[in-house]
Structures are given as C-alpha cells and as structure tokens.
C-alpha cells in the first residue's frame, strides 16, 4: 500500500477498447465511485481522460484484492493491474478485472466538495476547493479546450512567421496613461504591474521584428465585479509592421477561425462532455462601423450619444442584432488610446476595431501612429506629459514603420468556446476584487 514501485501507466481510460480483450493493462487514477454487492464489487476509476469500469468478482480474484476493493473510498488514489474483458453489456463494451490493486493515497472523508457532480455547489465554494473542482469531467473539458485554443494560436502564429516574445510585467508607468494600475514597492522606487504589453510591442516594430506575439498575464486594477471581468487575465497580443488595421483584422479572423477548426478536430470528446453546439464560423466576420452600431442601439431604445463608449445596454442591443462574431470599426478617436491612428480623411474617427461575440468584447486593436511628432502631440492633447513616455517615444525617432496589432482576451475567448456564463469558470485560480486565494 502507498507504493507505486515499478508500476507505470500503460493506458489512459479512453485508450482501452473492447478489441484489447485479454490484454493486461496498468491504470492509475482516482476512485470515482465504488459499489460492493456481496461477492461482487464495481469500481469506477477516473483519470485525466475519463472514466473506466472495473469489476471485482470474488471468485476470479484473490481474497486480498477483493477485500482491498471493498475498503476503497471515494477519491482514493489507486493503481490497478488487470485484464481487459470484452462484455457487450458493459458501458463501453468491456470491463477490466483487477489482478492487483495498490492504494497510493487515501482521501479524507467526508469530501468538502463532490467531484462526481452529484451534489451541486456554488461557484465560490467550488473555487475555494479548486483542486477538487477541477477533477470534475466538465471542468477538465473547459481547460482542455482552453489548452487546445492556445496551442492552435501558437501554431497559426508560427505558420505565419511571427516571433514569440516576452515583455516586462514590472513597469515604471501606465501603458495607456490610465489609473487602473496595481502599485508595488520596487526597491527605492514605485513600480506597477503591467496592464498591457502595447508599448513594448511597438518598440519591437522599430527593432525590425516585423511580426511578434505574446501570451501572458496583464493586470488591471478595475473595481468591476461582473461575470466577465477579472483583475488578472491572460492576453494574446500581436503587432505587425508594414500593415494597416484591415490586415490586423484579417490576421485575427484567421487565428480565431483556426481555433474553432482545431478544437472541433482534436477535442470532440470535450465538446460532447460540455454538450456544446459547436459551430465553426465563416473565415471572415461581419463588420459594422461604430456609427452603425450606435444607430442599432438607439433604434432599440438605448440612450447613447455619438462619441460615447458603448454602454452595457448598448452592447446588449447591438449583440442581439448581430449575433455571433462581428467587428465594430471606425471608432471615435476620443474613445481610443493615444497611440491609435486617426483616419486621414476624418480625424474624428480612427483606425480601431473591436471583435465582439454577441454582446461580449473579446479583442481590441488598431493601426497605430508611427510618426514621432504626431504621437507627441497626441499624448499632450490627452493631458499627459510626453516626458513620462521618453523611452517609448525614442523608438519613433529613428525609423518606425507603419504597424498595427491587437489583443485577444484568452479568458473571454474560452468563455465563448465553452459556452460559459462566468469568466471564473475559465480560469484555474481567478483573481478578482474579492479573491486572492487559493
């Protein structure tokens, strides 16, 4: 007992099939459920890939194995060496009869949370015991799809010639001149947790990298307490040289479309576990201008003036009209960050876009200002001091190419892919205004 010794897993649960009749296997995992019925015991073993049934008939196993099986408790960690026996009446067309069972660790009882999903629990209770919560097949399915999404994105960027980079998360000032920053003590100075890699991405365009991406944490000291906001999030950021905002949107369409196709192909069992109506979007998404979006909101009774950022009610009205994935383009310049390039024919609007899914914004991007003088003027016009951006601005004095890019929220994108209503379902250990543990 409690010793793995020389045993090593030969198969995960989903790899065992009826055609393996008579074959010996070694399985490892947790006791999902146990039933002892006289001279027969049924054990459902759960591992990362699913559930598998083991039958322990007293007349076919030695007495020690049978008695050990009866003493197992829920969530005990075990390994078994047994034989696959084809059986048409069994759930998957086969059973495994253990020849030997080893208990690697016992679980305390009662459990503070039921991983079998038979006893429902509120999300805060589940997050407090996240290590148990993520044993649930549906929760594991969410994070397997998330993993597949990130894998797909890296694959697409690699195929398109992007370089993966890592930018600092300890910064001296705000990226966008805002106040949504977490201050920290940095030796004799004050520093902040990075809210965006934006300025660093642009500096790399001056360095001649042409196309870069980063997948990393961002931190925002927003006091929102909603189902779609977190204070620590994963952002998928990219920047490209010698392109405009339309090229950036096309790249975003390709990244998102490829995610859907890769998930459908590689994660069918997780799609089934979550009972998703998984539809692959078209390769290009519908586009509406900000002005058109405002008209839609007003037509549905939402009070909004041109030039205002979209309210929650406006987003809901527009999302109900559009449905699915779509872009909102040609935003009012005053609503976007200082580095966003105004339209050459009408400086009241700029070359910015948001990618929406129904009422949820999942990505924001734009073509950037690449001329030094224009950027300095725009910073000053916004009431900020250009001296605060000295190292950033210097990159624009020595040959900055035209460039554009975007940031895609990995957590919100996971919400869409897995049809979750709360972003906390899509983050292993979420950080919001109230939650700093576990």
Curated annotation (Swiss-Prot):
Residues bound to ATP: 220-222, 228-230, 361, 409-412
EC code: 6.1.1.23
Region span, Aspartate: 198-201
Domain of life (superkingdom): Archaea
Main localization category: cytoplasm
Residues binding Mg(2+) 2, per UniProt: 361, 364
Alphabetized CDD domains for the sequence: AsxRS_core (cd00776), ND_PkAspRS_like_N (cd04316)
Entry's Gene Ontology molecular function annotations: aspartate-tRNA ligase activity; aspartate-tRNA(Asn) ligase activity; ATP binding; magnesium ion binding; RNA binding
Any single biological process term in GO: aspartyl-tRNA aminoacylation
Annotated localization: Cytoplasm
Sites marked Important for tRNA non-discrimination: 91
A GO CC annotation given for this chain: aminoacyl-tRNA synthetase multienzyme complex
Cofactor note: Binds 3 Mg(2+) cations per subunit. The strongest magnesium site (Mg1) is bound to the beta- and gamma-phosphates of ATP and four water molecules complete its coordination sphere.
Cofactor: Mg(2+)
Keywords, alphabetical: Aminoacyl-tRNA synthetase, ATP-binding, Cytoplasm, Ligase, Magnesium, Metal-binding, Nucleotide-binding, Protein biosynthesis
Residues reported in the UniProt entry to bind Mg(2+) 3: 361
Reactions listed under catalytic activity: tRNA(Asx) + L-aspartate + ATP = L-aspartyl-tRNA(Asx) + AMP + diphosphate
Residues given in the record as L-aspartate binding sites: 176, 220, 364, 368
Stored HAMAP family: Asp_tRNA_synth_type2
Free-text function comment from the UniProt entry: Aspartyl-tRNA synthetase with relaxed tRNA specificity since it is able to aspartylate not only its cognate tRNA(Asp) but also tRNA(Asn). Reaction proceeds in two steps: L-aspartate is first activated by ATP to form Asp-AMP and then transferred to the acceptor end of tRNA(Asp/Asn).
Family: Belongs to the class-II aminoacyl-tRNA synthetase family. Type 2 subfamily.
Subunit structure: Homodimer.
Protein name: Aspartate--tRNA(Asp/Asn) ligase
């Amino acid at each position: 007992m409690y010793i793995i010794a020389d045993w090593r897993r030969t198969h995960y649960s989903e790899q065992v099939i009826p055609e393996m009749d008579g074959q010996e296997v070694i399985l490892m995992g947790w006791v999902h459920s146990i039933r002892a019925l006289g001279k027969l015991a049924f054990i459902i073993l759960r591992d990362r890939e699913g559930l598998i049934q083991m039958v322990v008939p007293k007349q076919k196993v030695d007495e020690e194995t049978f008695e050990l099986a009866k003493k197992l408790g829920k969530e005990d960690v075990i390994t078994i060496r047994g034989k696959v026996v084809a059986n048409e009446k069994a759930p998957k067309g086969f059973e495994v009869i253990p020849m030997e069972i080893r208990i690697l660790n016992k679980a305390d009882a009662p459990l503070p949370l039921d991983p079998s999903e038979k006893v429902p629990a509120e999300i805060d209770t589940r997050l407090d015991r996240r290590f148990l919560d993520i044993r649930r097949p549906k929760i594991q399915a969410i994070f397997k799809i998330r993993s597949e999404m990130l894998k797909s994105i890296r694959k697409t960027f690699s195929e398109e010639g992007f370089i993966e980079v890592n930018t600092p998360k300890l910064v001296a000032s705000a990226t966008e001149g805002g106040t949504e920053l977490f201050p920290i003590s940095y030796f004799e100075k004050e520093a902040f947790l990075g809210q965006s890699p934006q300025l660093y991405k642009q500096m790399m365009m001056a360095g001649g990298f042409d196309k870069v991406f980063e997948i990393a944490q961002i931190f925002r000291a927003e006091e929102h307490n909603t189902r779609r906001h977190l204070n620590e999030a994963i952002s998928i950021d990219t920047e490209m040289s010698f392109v405009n905002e339309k090229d950036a949107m096309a790249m975003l369409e390709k990244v998102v479309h490829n995610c859907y196709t890769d998930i459908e192909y590689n994660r069918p069992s997780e799609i089934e576990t979550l009972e998703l109506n998984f539809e692959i979007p078209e390769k290009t998404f519908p586009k509406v201008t900000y002005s058109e979006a405002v008209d839609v909101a007003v037509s549905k009774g939402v009070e909004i003036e041109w030039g205002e950022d979209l309210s929650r009610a406006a987003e809901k009205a527009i999302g109900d009209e559009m449905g699915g994935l779509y872009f909102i383009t040609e935003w009012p310049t005053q609503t976007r960050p200082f580095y966003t390039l105004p339209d050459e024919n009408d400086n009241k609007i700029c070359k910015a876009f948001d990618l929406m899914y129904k009422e949820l914004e999942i990505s924001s991007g734009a073509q950037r200002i690449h001329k030094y003088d224009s950027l300095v003027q725009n910073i000053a016009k916004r009431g900020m001091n250009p001296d605060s951006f000295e190292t950033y601005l210097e990159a624009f004095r020595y040959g900055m190419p035209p460039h554009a890019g975007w940031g895609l929220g990995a957590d919100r994108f996971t919400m869409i892919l897995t049809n979750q209503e709360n972003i906390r379902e899509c983050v292993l250990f979420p950080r919001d205004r109230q939650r700093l543990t576990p």
